Amino acid sequence: MNSKFSKIGFILAVAGSAVGLGNAWKFPTLVGQSGGSAFILLYIILTLGVGFVIFLAELSIGKISEKDPVNAYEKLAPSNKKAWSYAGFTMIGAILIVSFYTLVIGWILKYAYLSISGNLYPDLNTSSAEFGKLISSDFVSQFVCFTLIFLIVFYTVSKGVKNGIEKLNVWMMPALFILLVLMLIYAMTKDGFMMAVEFLFVPDFSKISTSNVLEALGLAFFSLSLGVGTIITYSASLPERTNFITSTLNIIFINLLIGLLMGLVVFTFIFEFGFDASKEGPGLIFVSLATLFQKLGAIGHILGAAFFISLIFAGITSAVSMIEPFAFYLINSFGMSRKKALILIGIIVYTLGILCILSSLDSTAFKIFGLSVFDLLDTLSSKIIMPLGGILAAVFVGFVIKKEALQILFGPYMKGIFFELWYIFLRFISPLAVIVVMISAFLK
């Protein structure tokens, strides 16, 4: 990398990486269906016990080495350097993710346009059919929107850490927060608001089950962008005298806060119109919410535009973070200029994105192991590469890096019993928890 983050820039960049589409279409639904604040409490505990622990492990790899993921493992390993360097190649998972993630942000861009122009769909059946048509037969819309988002993401990364990634997050993350607060203020005037508050915050411990614990465990890991080199790469540009602990806790808090704000906004309108509160994922965003924004008339067009734009912001900040690890590796290892590195990565990402579109247009084409290209990339990244990357980081820091080096690194910020607890969790509990998540994902 060619520069360092500022302290606030680092926090906002990593928070931008963590805050993504799942904050709108998965987290709120899980909270509401799984015991409200009881689930939130469970999620916070597991985030501190798993996500926080492995986050600090990846941060320590990046900070001590000041290298990209591949070279970081190789530099810090006292022996078997080449073997450990392969652990850094889990950053390929980020390239797979950004290939289909950018396409999804493109869909959201299309819906932002429909909302601004007042052309969203008036009922659930029409909304469902039109969304199905978009992803199964509308190549032009998908191609144009995907290409626009692709260009924004790569242009941002081309400017480097300070002038690209940090600048984007320094204005986009506050803008996301302001949009959500404005939508929340309007939502508070609606009858559905108190129903949303009850749905999200009234604790119901009877709903906590083994399945919910596994869901919370998965969220605790995946919501912090672990396992694909992002944290290692960003930490290589961490400014001196940064308090790692408070920075990490701030990132976790921002991620949770955005998820809850999204939830209050989303479910206020869901309950206001009596829609199905059990939907999640694309069905929640592109069908239920798109319909109710249209039903609200002129104010709905404004709210819809604000909501979809906020999702675009959340998506772009995440996508940008996924490009940087591989770019940093190519620059370090092959002496490439940032421009050449991004051209190479761009060709890969753009090709995979187009294949995702073509695969969705023809369900019989581009099938691998019975999966569309989109589903295959999702499965490889989220069920295999990300968990594996997190496990390898925990094992490497817990058993390969000397404990004394970690005590020196964290000494000013985490001492005594707190360090020892973190170290025990890092070596034994957190990796086992991620293995459980990995196995449960395959058993679904």
Question: What kind of feature is each model-predicted range?
Answer:
Residues 372-397, 415-444:
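A generic transmembrane alpha-helix motif of multi-pass inner-membrane proteins
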Residues 105-137, 237-241, 246, 250-258, ...:
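Helix-loop-helix connectors at the membrane interface of multi-pass transporters/channels
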